[in-house]
Structure formats: C-alpha cells, structure tokens
C-alpha cells in the first residue's frame, strides 16, 4: 500500500509540474504578446532596470541550482501546491524565461513591424482579436507537437534503453550537459551585468539653476574689476526659467513616485556621450527616430510617408485639440486639393499638344520660320477668397531661390499693406504688431480655469517714450571716427538681419527637448574664478601639467637677496603675481578611450568592432576597415605573386602599377623620413609613460649619465690624448681642450624638451619626466684646427645610455671618429707615394705590352703557316686553280691580320713618342693611366698572393736551404774524414766514385747562384766539346718564358723533329712535348697524322727547369751510353716532372694564380664523368681494357715507364689511385673526407730513424739497362708499429701482399718528388729542427693533391723480401705468369707458418682490422671535452717509445684526467674490457660493389697509364693483345682508353675517316727492338677493330647525346661534368656479332 501511495504521489507531482510549466509558459507568452501592442509595457520590459530585477536573479538562481541542488532541497509533506517550492520554481522558470526573450535576444524590428501592421489595419479591434486567437492556436499546436514527439520517444523502447544506457548511466554526459548549461548561464549573466546600470545612486546632476548662479557671480566679479567698461548684465529670459519651474511644480504626484523611476526618461545615470553646447542652454535630447512615419496629402490623396518628421505630427495633434475650440463653424477643408489635380491635367494636355506640334513641324519640307516657345516655371502663389492668385516675389519664392522656413504675413499688418524698406523707423514703431495666434494657442492651457476668459482678449499696450530713448541712445555717436564711418560706409539694403528686424517674418520655431542639467569638463572646472564646482562631469583627456614659471619661488629668491626693509607695495604685487603660474599641459600620444565620456554612464556593448590582431591599440569600425594599412593587402600580395610566378603573366599589371606610381622627390623622401622618426620618438616616449616607476628610473639614469660624462669620461679623454701627444714628442693641448670642456653646459628640460635652467629642476620631474640638453657638446680631436662650428652640432640631448641625440627620444647620432683626420692624412701620403711608384712602373708596362704584341704576331704567323701545311694534303682531289685561289685567300687574310696587329702595336708604342706639349698626348696618357690603375686595382689581390708566395720562397725556403746545406756539408766532411782514416786510399777513391754515381742530391733552381754546387755545375758548361742538344735546350729554357713557348712551337714542326737526336726525343717525349708517333713517324705518310696535329694544337705542355737541370748534369753519362735502352740508375726523370713547385707553368702564369681546390674539384668531376662514360662503353665487357702497344723486353723487377705528363685540365684525366685490395673493394670515391684538400700532417707521425720500404715511391724509366740494379733504400716516413706493442687503439691498415711486393720496383707514382731527397737523407737528429721534408712534401702535394701513391697511408706490415733480379727469363708472358703464381703460393705458405705462432687474441684483432678500415665509438655516457682529450693523449702515447716520461709530464701539466682512467686493480682482456666498459668501438664496413670487379681498377689504370703503362698486378695479370704486324708496321695506341672523355668524341670523328691509313706508322719506334716479346691475337684483328669501332664511336656517341639532353632538361646545366648525377641507362649496349 505504501508503494502505491508513493506512486500516486509521484504521478500527482508530475502532473502538477506539467500544469505549472504550461501555465507559466502561456502566461509569459501572453504578456509578451500584449507588450507588442502596448508600447509602455514593451518599453518597460526592455529597460535596463528590468534586467536588473528579473534577468540577473533568474540567471544566478539557475546557476546555483545546477551546481548545487542541495541548496534548494526542501522536504515538505504539505499538499498545498503553492507552498511547494519546486512547483513554484517551475512556474517562475517558464514565466520569466518568456519575459526575458526580448532582453536576452533583443529584436528591434519586431516593434516596428507591429506598429506598421496596427497602422495599416482600419479595424484595430478585429486585428487584435484575430491575432490573439492565431497566437493561441499556434501555442497549443506547438505544445501538442512537442508532446507527441516525446510520447513517441517513450513508446520506442530501444530509444529509451539507449538513452538510459549511454546517457543517463554514463555520468560524463550528465556532467558535460550541466557544465555547458551552467557556463552558458554564467556568460549570459555577465553580459547582462555589463548592460545593466548600477543600482547604487550616483552623484547629483549639476542643475541649471546652479550653473546660472555661477555665471552671474562671475559676471558680477568682472563688472567690479572693470569699472570703466560698463557691460550690460546678460540674463536668461524669464520665460525659460519660469517654464521649467512651473513644469516642476505642476508635475503630478504619480510621476514623482519611486516606482516611476524605473521608467523615467532621465534615468538614474547619464547618457554615454554629451552634446556640448557653448551657450547657456542645456544639451539637446536626441530622441528622434528616422523610422517614424505618418500620413500627408499629396495630389489630393492621403499617402504614407516613412520619413515624416515627428515634430510635425505632434504639432498637428496639438492643433487638432485646440482649433475646434476657436473655429467650430469651419471645417478642415483644403481647397488646393482639387486645383492640384486639375493643374496636373492641364499640364499633361499642354505637353501632348506641344509634342504633336513639334512632330508636325518636322514632317514639313518647307523651311519654317523661327518658332519662339515660352518657358514655363512653377511659381508659388497666395490664394485667398478675397484676393486672386498673387505670385510671391522672386527673392522669397522657394521654388526659384531655394527653401525658406517662413512666410510673409502681410494680412497681419494693420496700418499699411505697402510698406517698403525705405520707410522711416519711427513709422514702424508707431504701429502695433499683432501677436501670432498659433503662439497663443500653444501657450494656452486648456486645463486652466481662465482659458475661456483669455480666449479673445489680447493685451495691447501703447508705446512709451522710453522706447524711443533706447533708440536714440543707440544712435549717439560721440567719437569722430564713428561719425565718419557712419556717413561714409555704404548701407546694405539687402541685409538679412535688417530684414528680420523690421519686416514681420514669423519663423516656425520649436523648443527642442533638452536635458535639465548641464555638464562641465575639467578645463571648465579650472576656469571658474570663484566657487568652482566640486567635481567635473565629463572626462577630459589625460594630461600632465608642467609648471614653466612660478612667480612665488622667484619672489622668495629676490626677497632673500634684497634687504628686508622694502615697501609693502612690493609684497602686495608679489601676492598678486603668486596666482599667475604659467602651466603647460602635456598630453601623451597614446589613445584615450575615456575621453569625452560622462562619469558613471552606462557603457555600450561594442558588437560591431573589427579586431584585426590579438591586441589592438586603437578600435576600428568595419566602415573604415578599408582605410587601414593591412599587412596582407591586395597590392602587396600581387607584388609577391608577381615575383613568384612567371613575369609575362602579370606584365601588364606591373606596367600599369609602375605608370601610376608617382615619382618621389628628395623632399618627399625627407618628409617621410622625418615623419617616421617622429613616430618612433613618440612611441618611445609613450613607452616610458606606461609604467609607473619608469620616469623615476629614467630621470636618475640621465642625471648619473650627465655626471659621468662631465666629470669622469671627458677629463679622462683629455688626459689620455695629451699624454699621447707628449709621448709622440708633440705639443700638448691642455688649454684648448679644457676651454671646450668648460664650454659644454647641461640644462634641465621638461619632458617635451623645453629648457628651464641649468640648476633648477622642473616640478614633479620624477613622475612627469625630464630631459637633459647639452649646449656646445665636447668633441675630442687629435689636433685643433680652425673650423667654423655648424649650428647642427651646437646642442644635443642626452640619452639613458649616455649618447647624443638631436631630438628627445631620437636616434643616437654618429660622433666623429678620433683617428679620422689622422687616417685622412695617411691616405693623402699613400696616394702621393702610389703616384710616384706608378709613374715609374708605367714605362715598364708599355714595354711589356709591346713585347707581348710581338710575340702574338709571331705565334699567329707560325700557327697559320702550320695550318696551311696541314691542310694542303686535303686538296689533292681539287684542281690546280682552286688550290691557287685558296693559297691566295689565305695569304691575304694573314697579311690583313699582320697589318691589324702592327697597327695595334703602334697605338700602344707610339704614345711614348708623342710630344708632351700636345693635348692629345695628355688625354691619351690620362686614359692609359686610368686603365692601368683599374687593372692594378682589379689585380691587387693577385699581387698580394704573389707577394706572399715570393716572401715564402725567398726567405723561408732560403733559410731552410742554407741550414740544410750546412748540415749536409758538415756530415759529408765528417764521413770523408772517417773513411779516409779507416780504409786505404784506393778503396776510398772507389767509394767516392760510387757515391757520386748513386747519390741523389736535391737539386734546386735557387736564385742563390753563388753557392758552391751551382758553381761546379756551371763550370762544366765551359767545355764546348761536351756540349750536346740537351745542354742547348737547357740554355734556351733559361732565357725566359717567351722563348720556351717559341721552342715548343718550333719543336712541334714535322720537319724539325727529324734533326733532333733520338735520346733527346725520348727524354722530351717523357715531358709530353713529343709523342712516340710524332717522333718516329715516316716522312712520306703525313696524311695519316691529322689527329696528331689536333693533339698538338689542343695540348699544353709543362717543361720544368729542374728537368733540364738534371739533363745538363748528366750530359757526360749520356754520351757513354751503350744501348738506347740504357738508363742511369740514379736519375729518375719522372720525379722532376712530378714536382709542381718549380714547373715552368708557374713562371709562365704568374699573374693567374691557380686554386688547388678548383683543381681538386675539376679532377673529381672529370673522374666521375669518365666512370659513367666507361660504364656506358664497356658495360658487357668483363675483361681489362684493350691496349695496343709494343712491349719491350725488360728485366725481372723492372717497370716500363712511359710519361705523358699532361695537365689534367686539357687532355689527360688523372684520377686517384686506390689503395688496398682491388679485387675485394670497388669504391668509386669515398665521400667521407671530400673537403680535405691537402694531407693533414697531424694525423701521421714522421720519423726517419726507422726504415721502411719506399721502393713504391721510385719510378723507373722505359729505357733501363739490363745490368742496372736497383737497391732498397729503406727509410721510414711513418712510424712502424711493432706487433708486440699492438693494443686496443693501434690500427694497422693491411695491404695485399700479393699485389705489391716490398722488393718490387713496380711503382706507379713518384709521390711528391721526394725520393731523391729522402733516399740520400742522413740519419741525424737535426731533421726535426728544420723540417725540410715537410716543406718539400707539402709544396709538391699542394700542386697535385689528387695523386696518391699506392703505399703512402699504409703502415709497414713486415713483409718478406724477394730478390729483385732472377736468373731465368722466359720468352713468353704465359711462362712468367705461371712463375708469378708459384711465387705467390710460396709467399702465402710462409705467411701461414708465421701466423701460426701468433696468439688467438692478436689474430682476431688483426682479422678485425683487416676486414674493416673505419671505426666509430659509442658509449652509454655523455662524453665531455676532457674525455676526448684523454683519448687523443692515449693515442699519442701509444706511438711513443718513452711513454712513462710523457705520461708523467701530462699528469703534471694536468692534461690527463685520472678520474676518467679505469682502475688497474682488475686486469682484463680486451673482450672482457669491452663488455664491462661503456665505451665500444663499432666497425663501419666500407661500401663493396659486387657488379664489375675490375671496373675501378680499369679506370684508375687508364688515368694513370702514363705512369704505369705496362705494369700490372701480379695476381691478376692479363695478356696484352697485340695486333698483327705486317711489313714492319705496328698499330698505334688506342687513345679511347688514354684520353679524357671530353676529348674522345672529337677524336673519334677525326679517326673514323682516316681508319684505313693506320698501317702508315713507322715501325722504328723506341719501344720496338730485338728484345721485344710480341703476343699474337688468336682472332682476326680486323674483325675486332670493326667491333671496337662500332662500340666505342657510334653507339656511345648517340648514347651520351641522350644523356646530355636529359641533363640539360632536368638539371638546367650544359656542363658535361654533371653526368655523374645520372645513374640510369637509356638503352642497353648492342651486341654486334661478326
């Protein structure tokens, strides 16, 4: 039963809540509906005080209700529903929410629409009833529809289940819903709080009576002061004050009730803005609306006007109430209505007739006379019953002259209707003016009792004599000046003021609604002399008053100085002056939004303000948004888009913009700069005003800066300058500097920069700010010279940082530099010295130019003659006449060129012989001097580099050379003395002879020709019987650069080469001047050498003077040569040519210094391009490159040398040699240290005490003697790491023992040209003093950084030695290969026996280091700099012998950190150490390519073919394929594998047309002899040649062209070196069978 009762109670409560909600909703909607039709209720609901009473409590209650429901928990067991708080809250909730609909969501158009509908409906009661029923039906329909939807949801169980399961049970949704609803209510409550006025009563308004009283008191005080000047007392008319008092007294009691304060138009608070009125009247109340509408008659019909003035409608309503009382018998009828319609009809008929007449006249063919049409104008007329229509005068007709608010009332004048302006004033004054009836009607109060009595009675007072007295008093002219002005000046007849006074024109006036109070500003409050108001009402702009002049302080100072006995009159004067203070108001530039606002006024909600940024200093309206300077404006975006996109698309827009842009003059630019600077200064000043304590800090800083400047800095500068002058033996300038220092004065100024005085501070300077102005600022100068000081530098302002500015808060100006005049004097002297030097150098430069012109003429003649000789054989098929023509044309062209070059030479040389008195000479000389100066300025950097290089060569190397020679002579003398004392005389003589033959001294072309060795070598040249062609060549080479070039051009001639000795040809051939084909070619086959001529023209040759010096030193030995294959054992000609320091090209190109980095980059690019081209050519060819060359028979262990030493930039591409195992590793280039240009000597520790094999450094010539033996000159450049001392950080890089034997002299490169220097180097301790080998190696390595020897960076591996010569020699190369394989097997067996003795740990470490070359360190800790420093010191200690001493010294110097070092208590093995410690070395395996095992080896061999022509690795020796020899003819070398890839295409085109003439080469080559072993090819050589021709010329030609096109398209380059980027293949190479 209890459960049933609870259920029934719950159902009853739910029904009661539903009923309460529906009733509250309907009642609220009903009141809202009534408020639409009843204006007072609508206004009451929209007032801000209703928001304070209804909205704010409602929202706050809901906010607390949703947050804490226990606050409203109320358990009541009573059945009365009214007392139940929940039901009443539901009712109020729905009721108040409907009333607040207009407050929360206000809609201004709703009220306007309702009033329009009410106005349009004639039957308003029917409209109200119909609209009410429609509203009621709509409300019911809406409620029912909501109920149906809710019932349908309840019936659907799955919707209820989902709602309960997911929403109600899940507390997150409930919390979110409550939070959202609560936050929304909170936002609405805050918005309402911003809109509502504060219910606290504010200060009382300044009423009009108080203002009038203050004004009267002020005027009375002025009259008392100025007694002489009598002024009338200005009083307000009694009418306005009486009306206001009457209105206040007659207001009903209902309006004074407290409840009416909510709806009072005056409000509790004041309006937002105040319309200031300069008169004594109050401010207007702006309550007119532009949307007011009313009816008016137009064309006899009532029409609706939406812009009808509200004042006119109110006036008509007032008239309707009062006119029936006056004129009851008359009805309101407008007789002009019918006339308006009839007049419009007449106008239409007249226009129709007029148009028809014009059309008829146009149709007539006869010439009509001139028709005069009358012009009609609408005029305003007066229409009465008594008088007919009379037009107004033109001056007063508004249809002609414009609108006039007034009308002439002639009927109201009683005496005479035709009064004119010329009538006398007395006649006007006699007549009485009838009062305006409308005015009387408006003033009448219908509610008063005396209304009927005053209906028709108008008071008429007669004129009095006093009126005329006032007129006569006004016309009294006492001054003679006034009389003359009154008589002479003309009188204006059309004066509007005169017309207004004496012509009775009544204007329609209306007393506008005004506020009952008058507000004042702060300035008006200050302006009151007596009884000023307590506070101002309107906020004025924030300003700071700065007192400029205070007479009280000056009076106090004057009184203290003067005697005390003075008159009291002075004291009274001082008192009167004490009130007169000069004050200047300083306004900040920052925006003040409170300016002009009324205190305690309600702020408006700024809904239509556009916010551009996060913080806006100024508020902008959307109306003026287009005038703002926006960052992302259209013209700026267009400019950016033009720069990014194609120029031709927006070319028209850009051109139009340029045309429309105005050219800025210098004045405009200066003005813009000034405005910009002024803006910046104002911003800085405002920044100091923002913070409260900023002005105090700034003022104190300025005072400290002025004290430091005046008392510390400037005296110290003066002291330092004069002490310096005394030290430089110059006269000090104490008096001048002190005079200028005393002249500088610091004046305190206001914040705006107005100067006050030197000692006094402005008032409130700590809060308002201060400036310090410096008059005649001190400027330190090195010496005093008379210069008039400009006014620009007479004053400045001091900044916070102690610098000078021209204006307050301006940019600091540049102070003159102290050493500027000193530098100017030095510049003048330097210019004079340069002029003297250049005048001397001028003549030498002219001479050089003349010599160069001579050389160019001769060289061009020689080249032209050679071209003629070369091109003659091509004309064999032509006729004799054509040959003669060609010859004549060529001779003409050569003659013309010679003439031009001689004229150019004359232009240069004849300028020296022109007379100095001619003007042309002076002009030409000035032009040449200017050109020379420009060239010298351009080449100044090159001159500087050459100067540094000369200093290095002449001083540093000179000292090294002297020290080395002295030590060498000393050691040689000691050796000779010891050898003489020990051995016998005969053995000593033999030893000396042997030493002379085997010794390799370092030969320098030094400039010190006075040395002993140079004298000995030069004395040998006096014997003319010993002269040879080599000595002649050497002497010619010593004459100069130009003669060497001539020598090359002469030697390259085909005829002269036959008269040179064969030995000289071989030696010159090694330097690249001659090729083997050119030297030993047949004379009767010149047409087979077209490509040789091309090579000769395109190649540049380097002839080193050291090379020729070696030739002349060995001229005796060359004459005693037995066979032509003999080669002196000591001298290796390659090393002189590889030396790049003393090459002839360095002397030839002194003005064009080379950059080693460019050479390295070019070599790398060339190498990459060669690799790509070689891959494309020999893609399927797995064997080595085919080389066609004669192989001479050589001894075992001797290399065949062939030197084609050409510069890598011209013909031959020199690529780096790759160390290590070539079979195992295939690395095109390791990109780890690409930026390293030179060898880093810090990475290698040099010592010459130990020995290591350096036979790989020594190069052997092709013409070597059988009996010549090459010894092992074992000196070590790199420290050897013993196997016993190998530890964790030792890193030996192993090489393949089978490829490079230690005893084999198969060297590829004479590295750095330092073999002779190091082989004959004595083992002494003096080498570390001078480091001669460092200088030598470094200089040579700089010239050719890309050439690396095969064993320079490989540590010694203690390889076993093999004898250099063997007894048995084989006749074929196959037998030698078998023997080499057997030797390698033996060597491997020996290595295996040695390796068995090693420990297991050492073997693992060696295998680890053999497999990997690079390591990286990783650890579990962050490494500091000290940790890496310790590692560097450990590595250094591992290389040293005396480690203990070095460790102790490092510990003493605190370079080793003992905390980082591990403790030595537990000795661990290497693997255990690596496991336990955090530092681990991880190997980095090198990149290994499996495709193409010999690809890299082939490329390197091709690029170094001039170094190792016939040398191959012993393990991978390949048979050389030699073509068939027929009739002692041998094919030449295939240049496809020698030349650089850039020259191959041009060479193929020349060879392909001369392919059949290859058999015309001479067989008497230096490489062909009886001792040569020839290897025959098993296949037919001609078929192979065809295949190679097609593969190497035709197919790669097209293929590389495709790659070039792709390269240009994809990478926008035309350089062939970029081909290394393209790693893809367009086509596969074709297989040609045949």
From Swiss-Prot:
Part of the Tic complex. One of its GO terms (biological process) is protein transport. The chain crosses the membrane at residues 25-45, 53-73, 94-116, 133-153, 172-192. Residues 216-242, 1365-1395 are annotated as: Disordered. InterPro entries: TIC214. It comes from the Eukaryota. The keyword Plastid applies. Pfam families: Ycf1 (PF05758). The lineage of its organism: Eukaryota, Viridiplantae, Streptophyta, Embryophyta, Tracheophyta. Residues 1386-1395 have a biased composition (Basic and acidic residues). This is Protein TIC 214. Its main location: plastid. Keywords: Chloroplast, Membrane, Plastid, Plastid inner membrane, Protein transport, Transmembrane, Transmembrane helix, Transport. Belongs to the TIC214 family. The keyword Zinc-finger does not apply. One of its GO terms (cellular component) is chloroplast inner membrane. It is a multi-pass membrane protein. Involved in protein precursor import into chloroplasts. May be part of an intermediate translocation complex acting as a protein-conducting channel at the inner envelope. It is found in: Plastid, Chloroplast inner membrane.
């Amino acid at each position: 039963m209890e459960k049933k009762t609870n259920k029934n109670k719950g159902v009853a409560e739910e029904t009661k809540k539903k009923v309460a909600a529906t009733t509250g909703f309907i009642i609220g909607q009903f009141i809202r509906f009534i408020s639409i039709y009843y204006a007072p209720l609508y206004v009451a609901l929209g007032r801000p005080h209703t928001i304070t009473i209804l909205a704010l409590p409602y929202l706050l209650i809901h906010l607390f209700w949703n947050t804490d429901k226990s606050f409203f928990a109320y358990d009541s067991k009573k059945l009365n529903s009214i007392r139940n708080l929940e039901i009443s809250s539901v009712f109020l909730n729905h009721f108040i929410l409907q009333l607040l609909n207009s407050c929360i969501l206000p809609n201004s158009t709703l009220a306007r629409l309702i009033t329009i509908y009410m106005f349009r409906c004639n039957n308003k009661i029917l409209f109200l009833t119909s609209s009410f029923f429609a509203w009621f039906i709509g409300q019911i329909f809406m409620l029912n529809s909501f109920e149906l939807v809710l019932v349908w949801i309840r019936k659907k169980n799955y919707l209820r289940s989902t709602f309960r399961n997911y929403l109600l049970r899940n507390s997150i949704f409930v919390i979110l819903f409550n939070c959202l609803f609560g936050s929304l209510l909170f936002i609405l409550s805050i918005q309402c709080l911003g809109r509502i006025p504060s219910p606290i009563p504010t200060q009382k308004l300044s009423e009009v009576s108080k203002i009038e009283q203050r004004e009267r008191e002020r005027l009375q005080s002025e009259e008392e002061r100025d007694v002489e000047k009598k002024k009338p007392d200005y009083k307000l008319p009694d009418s306005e004050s009486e009306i206001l008092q009457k209105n206040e007294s007659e207001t009903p009691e209902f309006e004074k009730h407290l409840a009416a304060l909510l709806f009072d138009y005056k409000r509790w608070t004041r309006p937002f803005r105040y319309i200031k009125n300069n008169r004594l009247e109050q401010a207007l109340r702006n309550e007119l609306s532009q949307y007011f509408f009313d009816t008016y008659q137009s064309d006899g019909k009532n029409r609706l006007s939406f812009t009808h003035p509200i004042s006119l409608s109110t006036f008509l309503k007032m008239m309707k109430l009062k006119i029936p009382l006056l004129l009851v018998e008359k009805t309101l009828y407008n007789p002009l209505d019918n006339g308006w319609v009839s007049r419009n009809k007449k106008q239409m008929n007249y226009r129709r007739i007029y148009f028809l007449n014009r059309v008829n006249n146009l149709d007539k063919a006869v010439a009509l006379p001139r028709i005069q049409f009358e012009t009609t104008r609408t005029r305003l007329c007066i229409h009465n019953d008594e008088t007919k229509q009379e037009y107004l005068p033109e001056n007063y007709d508004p249809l002609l002259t414009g609108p006039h608010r007034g009308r002439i009332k002639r009927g109201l004048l009683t005496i005479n209707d035709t009064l004119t302006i010329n009538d006398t004033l007395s006649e006007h004054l006699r007549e009485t003016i009838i009062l305006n009836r409308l005015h009387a009607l408006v003033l009448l109060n219908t509610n008063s009792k005396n209304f009927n009595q005053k209906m028709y009675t108008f008071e008429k007072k007669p004129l009095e004599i006093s009126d005329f007295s006032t007129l006569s008093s006004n016309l009294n002219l006492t001054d003679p000046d006034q009389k003359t002005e009154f008589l002479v000046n003309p009188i204006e007849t059309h004066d509007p003021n005169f017309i207004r006074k004496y012509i009775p024109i009544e204007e329609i006036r209306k007393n506008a609604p005004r506020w009952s109070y008058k507000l004042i500003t702060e300035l008006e409050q200050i302006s009151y002399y007596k009884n000023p108001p307590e506070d101002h009402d309107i906020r004025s702009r924030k300003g700071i008053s700065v007192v400029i002049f205070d007479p009280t302080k000056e009076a106090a100072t004057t009184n203290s100085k003067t005697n005390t006995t003075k008159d009291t009159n002075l004291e009274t004067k001082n008192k009167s002056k004490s009130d007169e203070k000069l004050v200047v108001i300083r306004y900040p530039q920052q925006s003040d939004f409170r300016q002009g606002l009324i205190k305690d006024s309600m702020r408006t909600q700024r809904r239509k303000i556009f916010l551009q940024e996060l913080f806006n200093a100024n508020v902008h309206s959307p109306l003026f948004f287009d005038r703002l300077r926006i960052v992302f404006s259209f013209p700026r975006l267009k400019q950016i888009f033009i720069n990014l996109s194609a120029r031709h698309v927006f070319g028209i827009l850009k051109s139009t913009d340029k045309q429309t842009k105005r050219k800025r003059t210098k004045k405009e630019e200066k003005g813009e700069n000034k405005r910009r600077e002024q803006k910046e200064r104002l911003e800085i000043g405002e920044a100091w005003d923002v913070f409260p304590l900023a002005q105090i800090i700034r003022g104190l800083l300025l005072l400290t800066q002025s004290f430091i400047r005046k008392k510390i800095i400037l005296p110290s500068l003066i002291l330092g300058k004069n002490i310096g002058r005394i030290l430089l033996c110059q006269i000090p300038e104490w008096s001048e500097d002190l005079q200028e220092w005393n002249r500088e004065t610091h004046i305190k100024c206001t914040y705006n920069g107005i100067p006050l005085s030197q000692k006094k501070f402005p008032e409130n300077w700590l809060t308002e700010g201060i400036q310090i102005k410096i008059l005649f600022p001190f400027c330190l100068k090195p010496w005093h010279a008379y210069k008039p000081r400009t006014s620009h530098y007479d004053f400045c302002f001091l900044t916070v940082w102690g610098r000078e500015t021209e204006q307050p808060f301006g940019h600091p100006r540049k102070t003159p530099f102290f050493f500027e005049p000193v530098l100017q004097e030095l510049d003048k002297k330097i210019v004079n010295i340069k002029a003297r030097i250049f005048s001397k150098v001028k003549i030498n430069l002219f001479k050089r130019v003349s010599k160069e012109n001579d050389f160019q003429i001769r060289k061009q003649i020689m080249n032209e003659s050679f071209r003629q000789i070369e091109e003659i054989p091509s004309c064999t098929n032509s006729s004799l006449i054509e040959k003669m023509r060609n010859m004549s044309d060529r001779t003409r062209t050569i003659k013309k060129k010679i003439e031009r070059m001689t004229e150019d030479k004359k232009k240069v040389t004849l300028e020296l012989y022109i007379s100095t008195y001619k003007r042309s000479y002076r002009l030409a000389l000035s032009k040449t001097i200017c050109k020379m100066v420009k060239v010298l300025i351009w080449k100044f950097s090159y001159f500087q580099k050459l100067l540094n290089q000369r200093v290095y060569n002449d001083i540093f190397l000179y000292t090294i050379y002297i020290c080395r020679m002295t030590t060498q002579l000393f050691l040689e003398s000691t050796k000779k003395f010891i050898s003489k004392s020990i051995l016998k005389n005969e053995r000593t003589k033999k030893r000396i002879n042997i030493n002379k033959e085997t010794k390799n001294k370092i030969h320098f072309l030094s400039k010190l020709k006075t040395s002993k060795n140079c004298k000995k070598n030069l004395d040998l040249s006096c014997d003319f019987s010993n002269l040879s062609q080599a000595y002649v060549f050497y002497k010619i080479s010593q004459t100069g650069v130009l003669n060497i070039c001539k020598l090359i051009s002469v030697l390259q001639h085909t005829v002269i080469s036959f008269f040179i000795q064969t030995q000289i040809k071989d030696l010159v051939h090694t330097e690249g001047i001659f090729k083997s084909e050119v030297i030993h070619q047949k004379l009767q086959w010149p047409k087979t050498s077209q490509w040789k001529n091309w090579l000769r023209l395109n190649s540049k040759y380097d002839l080193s003077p050291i090379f020729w010096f070696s030739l002349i030193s060995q001229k005796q030995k060359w004459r005693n040569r037995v066979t032509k294959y003999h080669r002196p054992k000591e001298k290796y000609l390659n090393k002189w040519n590889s030396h790049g320091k003393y090459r002839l090209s360095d002397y030839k190109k002194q003005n064009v210094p080379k950059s080693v980095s460019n050479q390295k980059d070019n070599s790398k690019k060339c190498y990459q391009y060669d690799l790509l081209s070689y891959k494309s050519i020999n893609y399927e060819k797995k064997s080595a490159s085919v080389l066609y060359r004669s192989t001479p028979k050589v001894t075992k262990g001797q290399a065949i040398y062939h030197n084609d030493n050409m510069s890598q930039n011209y013909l031959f591409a020199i690529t780096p040699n790759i160390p290590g195992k070539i079979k195992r590793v295939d690395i095109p280039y390791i990109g780890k240290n690409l930026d390293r240009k030179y060898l880093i000597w810090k990475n290698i520790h040099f010592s010459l005490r130990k020995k290591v094999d350096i036979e790989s450094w020594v190069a052997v010539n092709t013409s070597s003697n059988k009996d010549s033996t090459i010894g092992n000159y074992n000196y070590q450049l790199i420290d050897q790491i013993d196997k016993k001392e190998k530890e964790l950080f030792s890193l030996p890089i192993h090489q393949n023992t089978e490829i490079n034997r230690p005893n084999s002299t198969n060297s590829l490169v004479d590295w750095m040209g330092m073999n002779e220097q190091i082989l004959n180097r004595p083992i002494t301790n003096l080498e570390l003093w001078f480091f001669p080998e460092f200088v030598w190696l470094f200089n040579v390595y700089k010239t050719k950084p890309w050439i690396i020897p095969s064993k320079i960076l490989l540590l010694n591996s203690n390889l076993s030695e093999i004898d250099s010569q063997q007894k048995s020699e084989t006749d074929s190369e196959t037998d030698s290969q078998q023997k080499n394989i057997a030797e390698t097997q033996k060597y491997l067996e020996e290595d295996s026996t040695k390796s068995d003795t090693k420990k297991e740990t050492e073997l693992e470490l060696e295998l680890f280091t053999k497999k990997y070359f690079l390591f990286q360190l990783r650890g579990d800790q962050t490494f500091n700099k000290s940790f890496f420093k310790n590692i560097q010191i450990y590595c250094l200690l591992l290389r040293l012998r005396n480690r203990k001493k070095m460790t102790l010294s490092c510990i003493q110097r605190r370079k080793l950190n003992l905390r980082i070092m591990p403790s030595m208590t537990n000795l661990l093995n290497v693997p255990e150490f690596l496991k336990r410690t955090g530092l681990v070395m991880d190997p980095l395996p090198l990149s290994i390519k499996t495709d193409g095992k010999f690809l890299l080896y082939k490329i390197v061999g091709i690029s170094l073919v001039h170094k190792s022509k016939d040398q191959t690795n012993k393990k991978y020796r390949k048979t050389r394929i030699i073509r068939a020899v027929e009739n002692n003819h041998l094919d030449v070398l295939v240049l496809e594998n020698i030349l650089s890839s850039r020259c191959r295409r041009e060479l193929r085109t020349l060879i392909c047309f001369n392919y059949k003439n290859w058999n015309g080469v001479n067989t008497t080559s230096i490489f062909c002899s009886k001792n040569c072993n020839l290897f025959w090819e098993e296949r037919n050589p001609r078929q192979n040649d065809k295949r190679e021709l097609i593969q190497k010329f035709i197919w790669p030609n097209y293929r590389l062209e495709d790659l070039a096109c792709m390269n240009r398209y994809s990478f926008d380059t035309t350089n062939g070196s970029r081909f290394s980027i393209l790693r893809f293949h367009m086509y596969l190479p074709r297989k040609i069978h045949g």
